Regions:
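Soluble small-group transferase modules, centered on the S-adenosyl donor enzyme superfamily
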Residues: 74-163, 299-386
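The AdoMet/dcAdoMet-binding core of the Class I SAM-like
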Residues: 152-275, 279-289, 296
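Membrane-interface helix-boundary motifs at transmembrane edges
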Residues: 11-15, 69-78
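Structural signature of transmembrane alpha-helices in multi-pass secondary transporters
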Residues: 23-31
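Symmetry-related core transmembrane helices of the 12-TM Major Facilitator Superfamily/SLC fold
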Residues: 52-67, 78-88
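Glycine/proline-centered helix-kink
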Residues: 31-39
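Intracellular juxtamembrane helix-capping segments at the cytosolic ends
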Residues: 1-11
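Loop-to-transmembrane helix entry/capping segments in MFS-fold secondary transporters
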Residues: 13-24
Length: 386
């Protein structure tokens, strides 16, 4: 861009260096201003699609300005003007389509952009099902009439906590979700610390999912930072940081699990909500997560929900076994068969597959890309009612 602008704006060869320097300075200042605008204005206040449409429209305007100023109009290139007009019309149509677009599964109650994606809350036409979406991908499902979750992982995280620890007095939840799990544990007498990186989900939880943040201690920061800074010790650590189609890889490394281990009592347990498969050729993430946990903890159990949702339980204690069976009395009736399957279906990962994940080498996003695409596709098809 700079060489082209230098050629257009330079009148004599003596001023080439000065003009290039000016253009470079302007470009640098523009990059800084653009980054600040995107980070602090466009991302929080405008959907990503609107931002893309505005950028395209601005580029079309710049083309028009160039021809008006430097080419003295469109007489020499008559085909440019229709192209500019067509581009502006397309931008207008795209903006209109985005404005009226809504999920096909029901009524949109809430829409807001955040630094971590577009957040939406959608009710089904009957009003019996409420969805929390991030970038159009389902993050949680709720029955507002029964005041119960409609996701298996909600019941499994709570159930595994009680099954593997006899009396969880202090619990750390890395990932708030919409607040269902921490609130349940708090009502049962546990002291709860919650670490959540996205403040936007707190607003959603309070408005649409009955979240009462006074029942736990909320820390709005990255989970890894909290682990390194905290001096507290916990009976249970729940890692539920799944977002979109995957979990943050920096929370799935050996170094991160070592930080968690330092925050855990000797008989404490770590409960993880993850997604993946165990079939040959598709088990890199699950096998690697198992190996990485075993590099830090003495006991690891895997509960496979058979539909991609997998739960890991790890402890510094040797010979970890459940103290009791899961209580199904609080599970939504529609989910009891699925929760029972996830509880009873304990499996072992293939020891020949996967690697120990570290901060220095964590290629999960590459090797697990096919699974993540599948998860994203299934979420998208569900949102379209297929």
């Amino acid at each position: 861009t700079i060489p082209f602008l230098a050629r257009v704006t330079t009148q004599t060869t003596q001023s080439v260096g000065l003009q290039v320097g000016r253009l470079s300075a302007i470009s640098t200042v523009g990059s800084v201003i653009g980054t600040l605008l995107i980070s602090y204005l466009l991302i929080p206040l405008a959907p990503n699609t609107y931002t893309m449409i505005m950028v395209v429209a601005l580029e079309i305007v710049l083309v028009a300005v160039y021809f008006l100023i430097f080419e003295k109009g469109f007489k020499q290139t008559p085909g440019v003007l229709p192209g500019i007009l067509a581009g502006m019309v397309i931008c207008g149509i795209a903006g209109r389509v985005e404005a009226v677009k809504s999920p096909s599964i029901g009524k949109e109650l809430f829409r807001k952009n955040s630094n971590f994606g577009l957040m939406q809350v959608v009710d089904s036409p009957s009003g019996n099902v409420r969805y929390y979406l991030n970038d159009y991908l389902t993050q949680n499902i709720f029955d507002p009439k029964e005041d119960k979750s409609l996701t298996v992982f909600t019941y499994m995280l709570r159930g595994l906590t009680h099954a593997y620890h006899p009396s969880p007095e202090k619990v750390l939840c890395i990932g708030l979700g919409v607040g269902i799990v921490p609130m349940q544990l708090a009502k049962e007498g546990s002291t709860i610390d919650v670490v959540e990186i996205n403040p936007g989900v707190v607003e959603i939880g309070e408005k649409f999912f009955g979240l009462d943040k006074s029942t736990f201690n909320l820390h709005l920061e990255d989970g890894r930072y909290f682990l390194n800074a905290s001096k507290e010790e916990y009976d249970v650590v729940i890692l539920d940081a799944f977002l979109g189609d995957s979990s943050p890889s920096h929370l799935m490394s050996r170094e991160c699990f070592e930080s968690m281990s330092q925050r855990m009592e000797n008989d404490a347990v770590l409960v993880i909500n993850a997604f993946g498969h165990f079939s040959e050729g598709e088990d890199f993430f699950m096998a690697s997560l198992d190996k990485t946990l075993r590099a830090v903890f003495k006991s690891v159990h895997i509960h496979d929900g058979t539909r991609g949702n997998v739960f890991f339980v790890a402890s510094k204690k040797e010979g970890l076994e459940p103290h009791r069976s899961m209580d199904m009395s609080e599970v939504h009736p529609k989910l009891i068969p699925f929760v029972e399957t996830a509880w009873k279906n304990t499996i072992d990962a293939n020891p020949e597959s996967g690697i120990i994940l570290t901060d220095n080498y964590n290629p999960v996003e590459y090797y697990d890309s096919k699974i993540r695409e599948e998860i994203r596709l299934n979420f998208a098809l569900n949102m379209r009612g297929k």
